[in-house]
Amino acid sequence: MTKKLDPPTAPSSDEDDVETSEDDSSSSEEDEPIKSLPATTAAAPAKSTAVSAATPAKSTSVSAAAPSKSTAVSAAADSDSGSESETDSDSESTDPPKSGSGKTIASKKKDDPSSSTATLALPAVKSGAKRAASEAATTSTKRVKKDEESVKKPALFQRLWSDDDEISMLQGMIDYHADTGKSPSADTNAFYEFQKKSISFEVSKSQFSDKVRSLRKKYRAKEGKDEPRFVKAHDKKAFELSKFIWGPKGIALDSNAKSNGVSKKSASKTKEKLDSVKQDLAFVGVSSTNGDDWFEKSSLARMIAGSGIDEYYVRQKWSSFTLETKKIVEEKFQLMQAKELEAMLDKSVRLTDLTSYFVDASKN
């Protein structure tokens, strides 16, 4: 016999609504993007309450189903992020319902965007720190290299002679004259050996001579001025020392300085001495009462005898001359000797001038 089967009982409307609500909520969870704004979460319970008031039966069933869904979603969120708690997931269980649905929808809690942003930004921060550290190291290395180069490279146009060196040079010229009684220009090599240890650096002979000429030229530039002005006290002190050296009564020799220490000033003194000698000779010749003494003591007899005449004969004839003749001869020879001395002096002065030209040429 064929047994009739009872038709399946139709589900109640409440069950249909619950299933429909579950399907809608599941589809909304798949379709909607995850939202976790606090304002939306806070507004969700109020809207859910309003929907529940409109449909009590549905609200009850949905409320019963929503926690389970929310709990599952919270568990999934905890497993993914590892940073959210069950309390936070339960409190944010629902999202605002779709417009026109009239049903509360349980939404899946969205991951915290701040934690995701922090996780993504962390490598960038580390990269920036490494870059800043590398740039700082590079800058420090460049600065060290630059400092080393600045130390290695000597400064251009570096001044060798300091103010103290100039004063020491001028004072050394005065001290050299006081110790030796000679002018520093008389023997430049001796003065160089005397003074070079007082200079702050190892000075060469050419540098030494150039500095002496430079100081003398600097003094000459201010010498002709009535009231020379000085910017620094050093310039004034150097001028006073230079005046003592190259001034009108200075100890050093000017461009006419001679290698043997004789200057025109000393030559004029020599000339004065010669004039006095000439006067003495003239006085002796005029006042001489016995011309034989002068002739006998002179070399004239030997000079005449040297030309081939007997010396005894010359002396004998000289004694036969009258006194007036002897005086005339004596005066003439004395004048001749004075002229010879003047010629010798003039020759000495000219040789001295010529020597000074050679000295100046050797310094250049």
Curated annotation (Swiss-Prot):
For region Disordered, the annotated ranges are 1-149
In this record, what's one Pfam family? GeBP-like_C
BP term (GO), one: regulation of DNA-templated transcription
UniProt entry keywords in alphabetical sequence: Transcription, Transcription regulation
Q: Which PANTHER family does this chain map to?
A: BNAANNG10740D PROTEIN-RELATED (PTHR31662), DNA-BINDING STOREKEEPER PROTEIN TRANSCRIPTIONAL REGULATOR-LIKE PROTEIN-RELATED (PTHR31662:SF68)
**Name of the protein described by the UniProt record:** Probable transcription factor At4g00390
Can you tell which superkingdom this protein's organism belongs to? Eukaryota
Q: Residue ranges under compositional bias (Low complexity)? A: 39-80
A Gene Ontology cellular component where this protein is annotated is: nucleolus
Q: Which InterPro entries match?
A: GEBP (IPR007592), GeBP-like_C (IPR053933), GeBP-like_DBD (IPR053932)
The family assignment reads: Belongs to the GeBP family.
Composition-biased stretches, type Acidic residues, lie in 13-32, 81-93
Q: Which organism is it from?
A: Arabidopsis thaliana (Mouse-ear cress)
Q: Which GO terms describe its molecular function?
A: transcription cis-regulatory region binding
